[in-house]
Design a protein with these regions (language model features):
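Noncatalytic, solvent-exposed loop/strand surfaces
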Residues: 1-388
Length: 388
């Protein structure tokens, strides 16, 4: 429950470059992504797109760490270039998280391509993606998802958006489809419905669910606001989608339907009144939905079945900004903040703060837990937290 730089740290590993990856863990391996500045030429500030200027060349890397010791087992550079667009200082150029099936690991760097490695760090295949034009200073950020034997990548931006399904072992494109959407940052969610895998995507115009085999749209539903960043979550046959930029929206949609579900009984409940998260994905734990409003550090909770509000906009003392998505384990909710503070909440009706823990790093990646160990990726360090 408690830790600091000097308490209950099993190991701490300095990482090259900068990143906001959620640690992806399989057995004794941890996979991360990062971007390393290497200097050199710069790009001009693009006032039309309101992006920040890029300060030089970057190397984009995939890392594998030993889960027991924190040692870096291998580090592979996949791309080096001056990025074509800048980014907000709070985001960076490596906000993506990889995905693995225990044999291979797939890492997307957005406009810099999609890469497949084996667990020994051998590059199996790579595939170029489209160069994205992201409005404002936000940069790119949607991570890939693994659906059956396909790797799914959503590339929503200000030009022609697309969704791709790649054969996981070869990198061949199984299908790709245009999407009528501006930039989004949500990661696609694979769900199994009646023995058939669907891929649910959050976006400004429509939440859509695609058939994994064909890419055909199974259902869609409007109702979200702009700049969709939180990833959909699933619980007990429903998918939950939220947005909190330029308005608020939260929809609970019953799975198993087809067609346009807007305004139908398939939308079990919706909430457009309360402040919803702009960045962190909602958490569902033991029938309760937890949402965190990242800039004002406010917690709201809801009954997942009815949508009834339990806690509305309760300020969380001790934390400033929240980009990481919260995690639940052992009856507790773990909420990392951007300044290095992680709150531990009791998963009860009042969500009381049990501990306030501080590390010397910014934490934007969501935590991961295995057994009695908690893994936190800071911008420059990887931590394994365990009771001494």
């Amino acid at each position: 429950v408690t830790w600091s730089e000097t308490e209950n740290i099993k190991w701490k590993t300095p990482l090259p470059g900068d990143g906001q990856t959620t640690p992806i863990i399989w057995d004794d391996r941890i996979f991360l992504q990062a971007a390393i500045p290497v200097g050199g030429e710069t790009t001009d500030f693009d006032e039309k797109r309101s992006t920040r200027p890029v300060t030089g060349r970057y190397q984009f890397i995939v890392l594998c760490l030993d889960r027991n010791s924190g040692d870096i087992l291998w580090q592979k550079m996949v791309y080096e270039a001056v990025p074509h667009q800048g980014h907000h200082p709070s985001t960076g150029l490596a906000p993506y998280s990889p995905v693995t099936d225990g044999q291979y690991v797939w890492a997307s760097f957005g406009s810099r391509g999609l890469y497949c490695f084996d667990f020994d760090g051998n590059l199996i295949w790579k595939h170029a993606l489209i160069q994205m034009n992201i409005r404002g200073p936000f940069g790119e950020g949607s991570s890939p998802a693994l659906a059956d034997d396909a790797v799914i990548v959503v590339a929503d931006h200000e030009d022609q958006s697309r969704i791709f399904a790649f054969e996981k072992e070869t990198g061949a494109i199984r299908w790709e489809h245009d999407r009528d959407e501006p930039a989004t940052w949500a990661t696609p969610l694979p769900v199994k419905v009646n023995g058939r895998t669907q891929i649910v995507t959050s976006a400004n115009n429509f939440i859509r669910s695609y058939d994994t085999a064909s890419g055909n749209i199974i259902w869609q539903c409007s109702g979200l606001t702009s700049c969709a960043a939180p990833t959909p979550v699933i619980s007990k046959g429903k998918v939950y989608c939220a947005t909190g930029f330029k308005g608020n929206a939260f929809l609970a949609i019953e799975l198993g339907h087809t067609g346009d579900l807007t305004g139908t009984d398939a939308v079990v409940w919706s909430n457009n009144e309360n402040q919803m998260p702009h960045v962190p994905t909602p958490l569902i734990y033991k029938g309760i939905i937890y949402t965190f409003e990242e800039f004002h550090n406010r917690l709201s909770t809801y009954d997942a079945e009815s949508g009834n509000t339990i806690i509305e906009g309760s300020r969380l003392d001790g934390i400033k900004q929240i980009y990481a998505s919260p995690m639940a384990a052992a009856g507790r909710i773990y909420v990392p903040g951007r300044e290095g503070v992680t709150l531990v909440l009791d998963a009860s009706d009042d969500a009381a703060i049990l501990a306030t823990n501080t590390l010397d790093d910014e934490i934007d990646g969501s935590p991961a837990a295995i057994g009695n160990e908690l893994y936190l990726r800071g911008r420059t360090n990887m931590y394994c937290i365990a009771a001494n």
